Amino acid sequence: MSPIIHSLLDTDLYKFTMLQVVLHKFPQTHSVYHFRCRNLEDTVYPLVDILDDLNEQLDHLCNLKYKEDELQYLRKLRFIKSDFVDYLELFQLKRRFIHASIDEEGRLDIRIEGPMVQAMMFEIFVLAIVNELYFSRIKTDEVWAEGERRLQAKLELIQQYEKAQQPNDPPFLVSDFGTRRRYSFEWQKHVVAAFHNTVPNVFRGTSNVLLAKELNITPIGTMAHEFLQAFQALDVRLRDFQKAALETWVQEYRGDLGIALTDVVGMDAFLRDFDLYFAKLFDGLRHDSGDPYEWGDKAYAHYRKLKIDTKTKMLTFSDGLNLPKAWELHQYFKDRFQVSFGIGTNLTNDMGQTPLNIVLKLVECNGQSVAKISDSPGKTMTDNDTFLAYLRQVFQIEELDEAI
């Protein structure tokens, strides 16, 4: 079968920004990542049916290297350092670090174990491969036509929103965050190009570096949960892991890439660590779980308490959004904050078929468990309930849901 991934740039920008910090600050870190499908009951056929094709695609993925024009593109990004690009010139994913199989319960199991400078780069590629293999078996012309109809409806809706904007209103800004859950690369490129060409004043960019390069648009992204989670197992007190992660980020980027992720141990615990120093240094915050209105109001109260003008800060929302949800949030917060929206599945896999809700998350670092305690029930992630309970205790977080 033909390869799904053709370029190592076909991933999200934050993989490069996080990898650069890992390479510079803790390159010897060992990590384990584990795959989960959160909606197995919704699949049309068992995911294990794609196993042979998946292994073939992984073989191909691990033969890819960065091309010279790709390296030159990365060098032009001001926050990417030259020694990091030199490292990428030699980079190749190693097949021995990733294993796809069937687990004891008959489910698709994917496990990545190896140096973090290798392991962390598999995630987006693997999720995109799983999605495309799954949907290619149930692909029809009618599905594509329905996707196109929905895409045109989205573009028309944005144009209505643009007309509703008052002359002095802050801009309504939307980005594509959909690589990991996309229907296919071809469809994602089609969607991103359509948004870029049709609503350029609203469409801010894409998280996909290859598409940003090919379409000459802005690549978007800063950090993901795995970056902060890794510090739970590094040489800092567990209570201080968030502060250590944010400080390390600041040391690396010196003011660039200033959107902090808040829900590794929940918003309340995050704000206890997000003191005046960090609140001034970081450009804003990203919401990825929990009630977005409650979250934004907490952020507003926190900045006000620190006597920081919230109109100088940005809130980025990226949790299960569609355009109407984003527009409502924009209306609610636009007079207090700069606001932007990262939309994933609803942009790149809204075809009339039920999307896969799949993740490939960091569960262990340097032999020690790590965990995410989400602001949303069902998004908490760990392989070790004992560590999860300890983490809750350290950060004074009540147990609201089961880890998955």
From Swiss-Prot:
Domain of life: Bacteria
Modified how: Transiently phosphorylated on a His residue during the reaction cycle. Phosphorylation strongly increases the affinity for substrates and increases the rate of nicotinate D-ribonucleotide production. Dephosphorylation regenerates the low-affinity form of the enzyme, leading to product release.
InterPro entries assigned to the protein according to its UniProt record, in alphabetical order: N/Namide_PRibTrfase, NAPRTase_N, Nic_PRibTrfase, Nic_PRibTrfase-Fam, Nicotinate_pribotase-like_C
Residues with the Phosphohistidine modification: H225
Keywords of the record: Ligase, Phosphoprotein, Pyridine nucleotide biosynthesis
Protein name: Nicotinate phosphoribosyltransferase
Recorded family membership: Belongs to the NAPRTase family.
GO CC list: cytosol
Function: Catalyzes the synthesis of beta-nicotinate D-ribonucleotide from nicotinate and 5-phospho-D-ribose 1-phosphate at the expense of ATP.
Biological-process GO terms, alphabetical: NAD biosynthetic process via the salvage pathway
Catalytic activity: nicotinate + 5-phospho-alpha-D-ribose 1-diphosphate + ATP + H2O = nicotinate beta-D-ribonucleotide + ADP + phosphate + diphosphate
EC number: 6.3.4.21
Organism (species): Acinetobacter baumannii (strain ATCC 17978 / DSM 105126 / CIP 53.77 / LMG 1025 / NCDC KC755 / 5377)
Gene3D superfamilies named among the record's database cross-references: nicotinate phosphoribosyltransferase
Pathway membership: Cofactor biosynthesis; NAD(+) biosynthesis; nicotinate D-ribonucleotide from nicotinate: step 1/1
CDD domains given in the database record: PncB_like
Entry coiled-coil feature ranges: none
Gene Ontology molecular function: any one: nicotinate phosphoribosyltransferase activity
Gene this protein is translated from: pncB
